[in-house]
């Protein structure tokens, strides 16, 4: 979003503002400058200028309690004056830009040049008849008409190049379009709670306006700037803006400034929105960033790395989230290393590219030598000046043949297949309730070997209901009759639950008749409020009598306290505190308990032990969560020191203990069975009591009675994995994790430790690939560390969603199984395409190479090769990459990180089919004219008309590919290749479409396609030979792979994948280096793989900037979304520097970059050079941001 957009945006707002000056008591500019202040400075400014926050509310014509009236004209006016809460997106790339990018492909450029030379030479006629003497070297002289047709081949090559470019550009364009749709879907998902006309409503983040009263709570990501009005115990993590890792406590009198993009780590409250969109603190930075990024991009045109631009725009805004930048870098590394598939593919493409280059170079050399020796040595012809153009034409023809071999050798369709497959899967996964945020997560899921799942809400329905209670010395196995409970106890119980729950938690009547009441807010609290209603009491009157503003002090729930307490002032000025929390934790703090008569009696430790045995354990063994409700009274004077938590949260009086049931989702046991069958271990990590957790794990089928497994509590787990010094040891973790199935009473740190322990373990031969689910703010680290992080779409906090790779829109475990299926399907789709593509490549290269060497001419012409290779492969990648997944995918074990891309079975298929195709093509080439009684096409003069002979070879070749495409649908040696073929209409359409186009090319292609129309019987033979592919496929399937020990596998990532990631850094960068080299165009054939680059770039750009980058339009429609990504954190070795306007720094950076050595376009023009470069450069370019690169300079400048 360039300077232009911003200046328009601002100037428009300023103009409006001056005209509306009198509408509100403060202008946008004033509010904007107010929000730039911090702490006491801000408090002083508010006091001096406005009086207090309430006065600001009055000026903004809003009420701190009722909120805005919410009428359309009022909202519209606010949007006009103060701006809207989104950031103007960057313009998408136009179709023409994409065409221009596709044209940058070096193989295409070489072909264009060759075609133009060929065109030019065909129009140039040397004088005199000596022309005839020149050409005799090669199968006789050409006649006048043939020479005239010389330009056709050149023109045809140019045309097919244009065709290829358009197909590529269209593919990229449609992908961008699709991801934009996905992006807007993510945007609509984001809602925030505001108060309008006294009602609490959820509205999309983009709808928030200045003056709105927003309700904020634990786990929120603030969508706009605002001032704190009231709340309890609110702590904010502002590291995303300031780089300070300490949490900041907010209060009206000390620090009321709340900034967009920061995280609520604890507490709750209300704020009045004062700045939105580009005027909020995040928006201002974002604006600077956008402008800076655009300038950089202009300067960076040379390096042709569109991806780099996205990366650059993202780099500056990182922060050391946990203080330690190194850890963060490691985490980023880990994410990079994640796309195992991308790494394997890049490596494979590079290897194939090398081979292709060598083959094409040899072809050209042999042709040139043969021609010169034959003409000037054997036939002893002098080099005549007038013959030069003819000789040059021969050389150009040889050159075109060489380039053709290269074109065929390079598997352009490969990255395209990945992109299509991922894009297709992501779109379909939305229907299966998986919202994919990082593309490669989809493919990583196919390799998952372990899933660490939360219990609440994922394995269970998260609809809490109290089913047992212990009140007044009696253990009730169902909801007690209210008349059997002492009236005083009952009143205390109702007050304790109604007041000491978030006021946003409510139970509403059902939407449809006969449905269950709706639970809104925290589900455990909903269960307790439901208990109050079941006791035929009502919590609303209690709350209206004691509104939220009147609460004296609140200790919010967090993972350390494991309880929540609220203090209120009684009518006699004394204080009462209500507490609730996990029973074993709260009971330890109780010294009294209410008896049946409602009197408090002493509660000794031995009473507590008895209660645990007789009440809590039986409840837990039924799979219930136990919650204890208690209270404590304090005298009015001296007022207690409320900050001294240890003294306050003690000496409580227990009112009751309830057992809450959270039933297992009916579909979960089946889903877990599928996982286990698919070789995936499911572990449950929960904060619940160990007995509850074990009971639920048995119900889900995670553990089966009588098996050898471990169920540990967090404390015990920590004791076992740490040495005497309290340090975690990997060997100790290795002893535990293989048997561990349930980790109970665990903290988020335990979860992170477990995930890291499993991922770093070298205990098993395959390194583990771990998926994790999380919903809480503090699950962030574990979600980031995991190979795939799943966040809950319904119950998850914004912080968890931001750290995740996939969002489960229905919070359901069975959706994870669908993700596994899709992931494996991506892997299979790519293997299918590889199998098909490599057969085409092997055959075409060998045919062109041997044909050229033996007959001086490639049996498959340049234009035909382009049709086969580029168009057909592009279509084939579409056909094979869109196969829908089936349940059978879940019947085999995960591939793991080291499984080669091309298995032995696939290698058998590739070579087997190549043998069949080569045998037939060479038979046709050397004896075809006798079989069909036609003229031989071998040794034809330079511009001779197309021969039937070579047309038959071309046609047979294409028919064999078509039928082999059907064979390629199965890669595990299955017999029935037609299985489920009609479930994939795209496949059928493409096969039939390709066949139809082939008929048109052969019958009407004429000179441009070097085709001569064929008779019906010749067509029949071609199709018959093609059909033979299917029969031959069955023959190959009969040969047992185990016998073919000599077959090598390919596309394997080296053993480095097995090393824990600390030592991986350089290695990871190597994979990445390959991808980066692809983008830099540093080596001739690397640039020759430029079309691969386009696709990889698209995958990578989407992977990195689908939701994180400014690269995609709308990708930041809401400012909320902008800060929601780790990419926008100032990450640097000196994290604690507030962000400064870095436009000049960025210019420096660009200058530095311009002077840096890799201005590759002119350096490596000779292929041999590039080969040497490859070996010497690796170490240099392997560092992720070499000192000259713009990203590095940006990092250092910040």
Curated annotation (Swiss-Prot):
Residues binding Mg(2+), per UniProt: 775, 779
One GO CC annotation: neuron projection
UniProt membrane topology term: Multi-pass membrane protein
Active site: 454 (4-aspartylphosphate intermediate)
Protein EC: 7.2.2.10
Disruption phenotype: Mutant mice, born at the expected Mendelian rate, show balance impairment and hearing loss. They develop severe ataxia before 2 weeks of age associated with the absence of otoconia in the vestibular inner ear.
Modified sites of kind Phosphoserine: 18, 1133, 1156, 1166
Tissue: Expressed in the retina, with strongest levels in the inner plexiform layer, weaker levels in the outer plexiform layer, and very low levels in the proximal inner nuclear layer. Specifically expressed in the following retinal cell types: rod bipolar cells, horizontal cells, amacrine cells and ganglion cells. Also found in the cochlea (stereocilia and outer wall of hair cells) (at protein level). Strongly expressed in brain cortex and cerebellum. Found at low levels in heart, liver, lung and testis during late gestation. Expressed in lactating mammary gland (at protein level).
Gene Ontology MF term list: ATP binding; ATP hydrolysis activity; calcium ion binding; calcium-dependent ATPase activity; calmodulin binding; P-type calcium transporter activity; PDZ domain binding
Localization of this protein: Cell membrane; Apical cell membrane; Basolateral cell membrane; Synapse
Annotated stretches, region: Disordered: 1-24, 296-328, 1149-1198
Extracellular-side positions: 116-152, 366-398, 851-860, 925-942, 1006-1015
Record-linked InterPro entries: ATP_Ca_trans_C, ATPase_P-typ_cation-transptr_C, ATPase_P-typ_cation-transptr_N, ATPase_P-typ_cyto_dom_N, ATPase_P-typ_P_site, ATPase_P-typ_TM_dom_sf, ATPase_P-typ_transduc_dom_A_sf, HAD-like_sf
Pfam families assigned: ATP_Ca_trans_C, Cation_ATPase, Cation_ATPase_C, Cation_ATPase_N, E1-E2_ATPase, Hydrolase
Spans through the membrane: 95-115, 153-173, 346-365, 399-416, 831-850, 861-881, 902-924, 943-964, 984-1005, 1016-1037
Reaction catalysis annotation: Ca(2+)(in) + ATP + H2O = Ca(2+)(out) + ADP + phosphate + H(+)
Root EC class: translocase
Cytoplasmic side: 1-94, 174-345, 417-830, 882-901, 965-983, 1038-1198
BP term (GO), one: auditory receptor cell stereocilium organization
Bias type Polar residues, positions: 1-13
Region (Calmodulin-binding subdomain A): 1078-1095
Job of this protein: ATP-driven Ca(2+) ion pump involved in the maintenance of basal intracellular Ca(2+) levels in specialized cells of cerebellar circuit and vestibular and cochlear systems. Uses ATP as an energy source to transport cytosolic Ca(2+) ions across the plasma membrane to the extracellular compartment. Has fast activation and Ca(2+) clearance rate suited to control fast neuronal Ca(2+) dynamics. At parallel fiber to Purkinje neuron synapse, mediates presynaptic Ca(2+) efflux in response to climbing fiber-induced Ca(2+) rise.
Quaternary organization: Interacts with PDZD11.
Entry's family note: Belongs to the cation transport ATPase (P-type) (TC 3.A.3) family. Type IIB subfamily.
Protein name: Plasma membrane calcium-transporting ATPase 2
Organism lineage string: Eukaryota, Metazoa, Chordata, Craniata, Vertebrata
Gene (UniProt): Atp2b2
